[in-house]
Amino acid sequence: MAEYSYVKSTKLVLKGTKAKSKKKKSKDKKRKREEDEETQLDIVGIWWTVSNFGEISGTIAIEMDKGAYIHALDNGLFTLGAPHREVDEGPSPPEQFTAVKLSDSRIALKSGYGKYLGINSDGLVVGRSDAIGPREQWEPVFQDGKMALLASNSCFIRCNEAGDIEAKNKTAGEEEMIKIRSCAERETKKKDDIPEEDKGSVKQCEINYVKKFQSFQDHKLKISKEDSKILKKARKDGFLHETLLDRRAKLKADRYCK
């Protein structure tokens, strides 16, 4: 086992070359994976498909068929709008609603006419209420990458043969599948807590801090000539900033050093 470890740690020319190639491939795969994630996002223009309850806020649209959205009529009823054929063509103003969160699982929806969406006694979706009551509460249901919208009568919405939007089925089939699209600014990646100066190699890190704190009286960077291995150990032990400050102090390259 000891001999095997020794052989594995020995840097041969060919092995070293492969190792670098493997590292490069690993970075390329990571970059490609991130690009694929962006590509796989279901986006039409500025309208992207939400994948969880937390993403539902502000102006949204409800897509029931490819490019076809729930469309508000001026009589308080709703129908399925004409499909938008253009690749980047999002929902029109009558197809846009304001989502209001009521709890951890329920929302209210307000049309462009200023009325809240609810259901009547016949199970039809209507938008005639000025306030949010029990009938104006909706529950988005996410399962296996699909989504449906549950009304207050415990039925899922769909578009019937007459073109009306109704909620009459207790179970969700293909006809009840929807997409909620949002035009809110999407948070693509969480920002890390690492300062920009601390990123990169220890040598680059030292240069970053010298640039940040040096007084630049002679317009030249003063970088310590001491071994950078000290910095590597300091970073590992959690004393990088203190070590960098000491190195700058020796060169009097920090305007805050006495």
Curated annotation (Swiss-Prot):
Compartments, as annotated in UniProt: Nucleus, Cajal body; Nucleus, Nucleolus; Cytoplasm; Cytoplasm, Myofibril, Sarcomere, Z line
Protein's UniProt keywords contain Cytoplasm: yes
Sequence segments annotated as region (Disordered): 16-35
Transmembrane annotation, as ranges: none
GO cellular component terms given for this protein: Cajal body; nucleolus; spliceosomal complex; Z disc
Signal peptide segment: none
Other noteworthy facts: Overexpression of Frg1 leads to development of facioscapulohumeral muscular dystrophy (FSHD1)-like symptoms such as kyphosis, progressive muscle dystrophy and skeletal muscle atrophy. It also causes aberrant pre-mRNA splicing of Tnnt3 and Mtmr1, affects the localization and activity of KMT5B, and leads to increased levels of Eid3, resulting in inhibited muscle differentiation. These results suggest that human FSHD1 results from inappropriate overexpression of FRG1 which leads to abnormal alternative splicing of specific pre-mRNAs.
Reported function: Binds to mRNA in a sequence-independent manner. May play a role in regulation of pre-mRNA splicing or in the assembly of rRNA into ribosomal subunits. May be involved in mRNA transport. May be involved in epigenetic regulation of muscle differentiation through regulation of activity of the histone-lysine N-methyltransferase KMT5B.
Entry protein name: Protein FRG1
Organism of this sequence: Mus musculus
Gene name of this polypeptide: Frg1
